[in-house]
């Protein structure tokens, strides 16, 4: 059973904004941020690319070729070819970025790229 949270409405408004930028969701631990984002993603995207930097440390190497969106997408695809990047239909969800703060630098490149939504 899913419990509706205040962030749910915010995520929907963010998705409707044609000029949306990558989103960083902050909050206390264990309040349901990840669950809310996953629920939102299942309702609004055809493809969800979830990268959890605690559970999947291998993804910390995705910036090895730089912070440009194309390089990061290529490196994620090399690590897991089953991940589908569909322009305009994919949410890339970087979870637990406090464990890999360097990935935040890539957000401006994803903003310029605009093919994928990023949280």
For the regions a language model picked out, list residue spans one by one:
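Phosphate-binding site recognition
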Residues: 1-119
């Amino acid at each position: 059973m899913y419990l509706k949270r205040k962030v749910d409405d915010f995520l929907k408004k963010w998705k409707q904004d044609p000029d949306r930028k990558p989103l960083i969701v902050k909050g206390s631990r264990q309040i349901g941020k990840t669950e809310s984002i996953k629920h939102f993603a299942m309702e609004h995207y055809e493809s969800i690319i979830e990268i959890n930097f605690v559970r999947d440390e291998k993804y910390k190497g995705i910036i090895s070729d730089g912070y440009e969106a194309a390089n990061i997408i290529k490196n994620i695809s090399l690590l897991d070819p089953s991940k589908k990047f569909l322009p305009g239909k994919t949410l890339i969800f970087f979870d637990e970025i406090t464990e890999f703060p360097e990935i935040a630098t890539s957000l401006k490149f994803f903003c310029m790229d605009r093919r994928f939504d990023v949280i």
